[in-house]
């Protein structure tokens, strides 16, 4: 008898997770694993997130809009420069997303599995800016 492996996402497998709250980051990582994604890198501070955004090997990023009181805009800018798709995660709704990026997919906190799955698919299907 052979083991059945979970279905892998079709277009991307590796995710950069940028979230300052450790428990939320851990929950998100578990949810991503359940959906068949791998966390390629994680960051909880702007400096770490910028470094990962510029150098890590990943297919998609999830960005908390506020990292310990600092807006995540520089990280989003770095991802755009690399042509990488990303999703914002926020508990503030649309007003929490930086103005230049209001058209990006937004994942509302608290996370729900189906919402996460849909936002990742939306980001992957969209154009890489």
Residue spans for each PLM region:
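Non-catalytic signal-transmission and effector/linker regions of two-component phosphorelay proteins
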Residues: 1-14, 112-129
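Two-component/phosphorelay signaling modules centered on CheY-like receiver
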Residues: 22-41
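Hydrophobic/aromatic residues positioned on beta-strands within the core alpha/beta folds
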Residues: 87-89
């Amino acid at each position: 008898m052979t083991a059945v492996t979970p279905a892998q996402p079709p277009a991307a497998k590796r995710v950069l997770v940028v979230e300052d709250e450790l428990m939320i980051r851990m929950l998100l990582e578990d949810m991503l694993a359940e959906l068949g994604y791998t966390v390629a890198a994680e960051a909880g501070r702007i400096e770490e997130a910028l470094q990962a955004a510029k150098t890590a090997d990943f297919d998609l990023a999830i960005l908390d809009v506020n990292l310990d009181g600092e807006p995540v805009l520089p990280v989003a800018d770095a991802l755009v420069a690399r042509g990488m798709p990303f999703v914002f995660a926020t508990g503030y709704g649309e007003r929490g997303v930086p103005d230049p990026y209001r058209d990006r997919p937004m994942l509302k906190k608290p996370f729900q599995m189906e919402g996460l799955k849909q936002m990742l698919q939306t980001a992957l299907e969209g154009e890489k800016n």
